[in-house]
């Protein structure tokens, strides 16, 4: 019988967290990752579940997520250590029937708990389920270096940051035509930043936390990692451009419109019309 640590979802979390650490996006215990599962994903591994699963009450009701299992990273856990001890650094949790709390079915050993950003994750999952008709299953938060750097030098508004990232790399408009949401600086952890993030997730698959990091959403771990990786690559290009004196030429408005038509995507209007 296969052990849960060999399952596609545990192995996927190991790869995503290891890759993110190697990218330099998740120093120490920075960053967190959650993947929405189906009952059929976890049912074959019930023999590996805790005999007496701990129950933790949520800070607010999440009826949309009732009876839904997730695999999550733990609070205070280092991404670089997930591959060394998955059961200590990851956990499979399942929301109860009324969305009031969850049981820790597997992992998070030694009384560990899920990430402190769980409210932001679960609220964002709710919005992305509605926005994508259930297709999006992953929420990833990391400290992508160049995206953070841009929040210090660009005006922090969605239209401008989206437009600059589109100009930084041709593929960006195709990968995130819905643009990049951005919050004001907020204290991480509490429900307030989670609610603000979820509100932006209604419209955008990427949301920046200024001077802190980025949230990304997608249908798979691979797609979500690639989404953030694409935006971060463009941000790196922009950081180099600004350090060399700024743009002398760039992708024009007309070219962005043509790009959207070629790939059948509708670019965020406020970013297209900015200049």
Curated annotation (Swiss-Prot):
MF (Gene Ontology): metal ion binding; rhamnulose-1-phosphate aldolase activity
Primary location: cytoplasm
Single GO biological process annotation from the record: pentose catabolic process
EC code(s) of this entry: 4.1.2.19
Record keywords: Cytoplasm, Lyase, Metal-binding, Rhamnose metabolism, Zinc
Residue numbers annotated as active site: 117
Keyword Cytoplasm (UniProt): yes
Pathway recorded for this protein: Carbohydrate degradation; L-rhamnose degradation; glycerone phosphate from L-rhamnose: step 3/3
Pfam families in the record: Aldolase_II
Binding note for cofactor: Binds 1 zinc ion per subunit.
Catalytic activity: L-rhamnulose 1-phosphate = (S)-lactaldehyde + dihydroxyacetone phosphate
Localisation: Cytoplasm
Record-listed Zn(2+) binding positions: 141, 143, 212
Keyword Ligase: no
GO cellular component: cytosol
Gene3D superfamilies hit by this protein: Class II aldolase/adducin N-terminal domain
EC main group: lyase
SMART domains to which the protein is assigned, alphabetical: Aldolase_II (SM01007)
Listed cofactors: Zn(2+)
Role played: Catalyzes the reversible cleavage of L-rhamnulose-1-phosphate to dihydroxyacetone phosphate (DHAP) and L-lactaldehyde.
Family classification: Belongs to the aldolase class II family. RhaD subfamily.
The protein's assembly and partners: Homotetramer.
Protein's recorded name: Putative rhamnulose-1-phosphate aldolase
Originating species: Salmonella typhi
Gene: rhaD
